[in-house]
Design a protein with these regions (language model features):
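N-terminal secretory signal peptides
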Residues: 1-21, 25, 29-39
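An extracytoplasmic/periplasmic, membrane-proximal ligand-sensing/linker region
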Residues: 66, 72, 76, 271-366
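A ligand-binding cleft/hinge motif common to bilobed small-molecule-binding domains
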Residues: 116-126, 189-190, 216-217, 221-242
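Periplasmic-binding protein-like
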Residues: 55-63, 134-146, 238-273, 291-307
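Extracytoplasmic small-molecule ligand-binding "clamshell" domains
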Residues: 47-120
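Hydrophobic residues within well-ordered alpha-helices
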Residues: 104-105, 161, 215-216, 258, ...
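Short helices/loops that flank or line small-molecule/ion binding pockets
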Residues: 98-112, 125, 143, 208-223
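Bilobed "Venus flytrap"/periplasmic-binding protein-like clamshell domains
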Residues: 54, 58-82, 94, 140-213
């Protein structure tokens, strides 16, 4: 993971501390400062506490390439969001899925853009609720997982990869990444008896940008990635991108979700959802500016209001992953295998029931 360190610094306005992505220790030092500064007015404390100025809303940002780049891309939308809700919105930008997952567990973000897998975890742990998701359209332009290799590399086709995975060096994303881990496992590797975590000669786990660079520079033979990040990579690294080719493409992935902390005031929930659903829809210069922001975030069609039922496809993917892992595992007995499969079925049934109940409650409250 990226490890360059910079100190936490106040914003130009002096309003609040913001964590600058660094090595993990520095990140959590910054986070602690944020938490202390804002804890007094957090709604989770249950208070209708009066404060002299609105408490900033902390927006968790998944890393695109670097954390600073991700924060800068989101800054215009967060500024517009703050004006719409009458409350500052500050970006909580991290260097990894793990860091953002820990921030969610520690209640250090209030709203976040998450992968479908991370959103599923946050919702089923009863920490967050779905506000909106990236709007998609059908066709080959949809967001899909891909496998990348060098055009002039020793590995240049899928048959060689599946036939002898132990020969090749893999670069992949965190296990919470749908396109960088889950879909390649479910659709390609596990059906061919290959465990992505153990079958390859070596393994690099990093961002989509870093995995593509690893293959382009000869530090890995194959990388998981996705069509959206590959498009961004081609714009930022045209020389390196020209060395790459796609040897496998998945079905369309579940969209990324924007989630809000459970217990947020209903009025805040409604205003945020209305802002996201309407962002980029206006005519004239304002709409043009918003659409440019959305394009930079690879959400050209904007966002659509959603509830927790939007995570049903993610729950099904998680079920398929767990089932295939169990079927490929070695078991001491058939009874042990069947017990595991039964637990997987029960977990999936509970998730579906929870998502449908929460979605129904959200719809009734509108």
């Amino acid at each position: 993971m990226p490890s360059s360190a910079k100190p936490c610094a106040p914003s130009a306005s002096g309003a609040a501390l913001r964590p600058v992505p660094t090595r993990r220790v520095a990140l959590w030092q910054c986070t602690a400062a944020l938490s202390l500064a804002w804890a007094g007015a957090a709604w989770a404390q249950g208070g209708a506490r009066q404060v002299s100025s609105p408490t900033p809303l902390r927006f968790g940002i998944l890393p695109f390439g670097g954390a600073v780049e991700s924060r800068d891309r989101w800054a215009p939308l967060l500024a517009d969001m703050g004006r719409a809700i009458g409350r500052p919105v500050v970006g909580f930008s991290v260097t990894s899925y793990e860091s953002l997952g820990q921030a969610l567990q520690r209640d250090e973000v209030d709203i976040a853009m998450l992968t479908a897998k991370m959103a599923l975890d946050a919702v089923t742990q009863r920490r967050m609720r779905v506000l909106a998701q990236v709007r998609r359209h059908g066709g080959n332009s949809d967001h899909r997982a891909v496998l990348l290799v060098r055009k002039d590399g020793a590995l240049n086709n899928l048959a060689d990869l599946l036939g002898n995975p132990g020969r090749w060096r893999l670069a992949r994303s965190d296990s919470r990444s749908v396109s960088g881990f889950i879909l390649p496992q479910v659709e390609l590797f596990l059906p061919n008896g290959i465990s992505i975590e153990t079958a390859f000669r070596s393994e690099l786990v990093d961002t989509h940008q870093a995995t593509a660079l690893a293959v382009a520079n000869g530090d890995a033979d194959v990388a998981t990635n996705n069509t959206t990040d590959l498009e961004r990579f081609r714009e930022q690294f045209p020389v390196e991108a020209a060395r790459l080719q796609v040897i496998w493409t998945s079905a369309s992935t579940p969209p990324a979700q924007i989630v809000l902390r459970r217990g947020a005031p209903p009025e805040l929930h409604r205003r945020l959802q209305a802002f996201l659903a309407g962002y980029g829809a206006a005519d004239g210069p304002r709409g043009d500016a918003e659409r440019a922001v959305l394009k930079s975030l690879r959400a050209a069609l904007g966002y659509e209001a959603e509830d927790d039922t939007a995570l049903l496809p993610a729950a099904e993917l998680e079920y398929q992953l767990a089932w295939q892992r169990a079927m490929n595992a070695a078991w001491v007995s058939e009874a042990a295998k069947q017990a595991r499969l039964q637990r997987i079925e029960q977990t999936y049934a509970r998730q579906v029931a929870l998502l449908k109940d929460e979605g129904g409650a959200a719809a009734a409250g509108k």
